[in-house]
Amino acid sequence: MTQVQKIHPTAVIDPQAELAPDVEVGAFTVIGPNVRIDSGTRIGHHTVVEGYTTLGRDNQIGHFASVGGRPQDMKYRDEPTRLIVGDRNTIREFTTIHTGTAQDVGITSIGDDNWIMAYVHIAHDCRIGNHTVFSSNAQIAGHVEVGDWAILGGMSGVHQFVRIGAHAMLGGASALVQDVPPFVIAASDKGGNKAAPHGVNVVGLQRRGFSAEQIAGLRQAYKLLYKSDLSFDQAQAEIAAQVAQTEDAPSREALRTFADFIAATKRGIVR
């Protein structure tokens, strides 16, 4: 199949756009002048890729998606901010992903091997890691950080500047306004949709190959933070001591990830 056969004749591609020879573009798709698309990427029909957007290798972009649009920020003044997407991501139908703003670092970034389902919104300046899952209709506001292997349930909403740690899970239809530590499940409680902590993501960690010793250590740290009478500062001190006393290197590293994350919180952790 030639390059001409892979680009539908109704697609509108700016002459300045840079597409690898094997990129596939569906019918009525529009690609702007400052877009770069690497090898193996396939873009469905009726899709818009615009702005200063870079798509890596072997991405799959669904029909009617809007990728690289202007940020929904009233302070935006047409600065040349960017969207950078890595490799092997799946971005399904009607998803919207916006470029960054000058008030942050000017970049919205998405790593590799992410699974982004239909109707997801990823706002300006978000930083998405690798191997994440965004279920349909998950909506994240500006400046949100999502760590590797995190999962966001369908119809969940995330407040701006919130951080979701690696291997964390946010339940469906949950509203999240504070940080979720790594390895923790947060989901809506009875009588409302505000997310609250619901233990360590044991099943997810087992699937990722975490050992029983690693999981036991994380459950102990979770109990210190959430199930004790300790203040936040006291719990941090106890978890730091737990890190120092843990001899198993993988367990110590997981605990350090947990401890460093909660120490860096600015919005507070989910309660």
From Swiss-Prot:
Its main location: cytoplasm. It catalyses: a (3R)-hydroxyacyl-[ACP] + UDP-N-acetyl-alpha-D-glucosamine = a UDP-3-O-[(3R)-3-hydroxyacyl]-N-acetyl-alpha-D-glucosamine + holo-[ACP]. This is Acyl-[acyl-carrier-protein]--UDP-N-acetylglucosamine O-acyltransferase. Pfam families: Acetyltransf_11, Hexapep. Involved in the biosynthesis of lipid A, a phosphorylated glycolipid that anchors the lipopolysaccharide to the outer membrane of the cell. Pathway: Glycolipid biosynthesis; lipid IV(A) biosynthesis; lipid IV(A) from (3R)-3-hydroxytetradecanoyl-[acyl-carrier-protein] and UDP-N-acetyl-alpha-D-glucosamine: step 1/6. Belongs to the transferase hexapeptide repeat family. LpxA subfamily. Homotrimer. GO terms for molecular function: acyl-[acyl-carrier-protein]-UDP-N-acetylglucosamine O-acyltransferase activity. Keywords: Acyltransferase, Cytoplasm, Lipid A biosynthesis, Lipid biosynthesis, Lipid metabolism, Repeat, Transferase. Its EC number is 2.3.1.129. It is found in: Cytoplasm. It comes from Ralstonia nicotianae (strain ATCC BAA-1114 / GMI1000). GO terms for biological process: lipid A biosynthetic process.
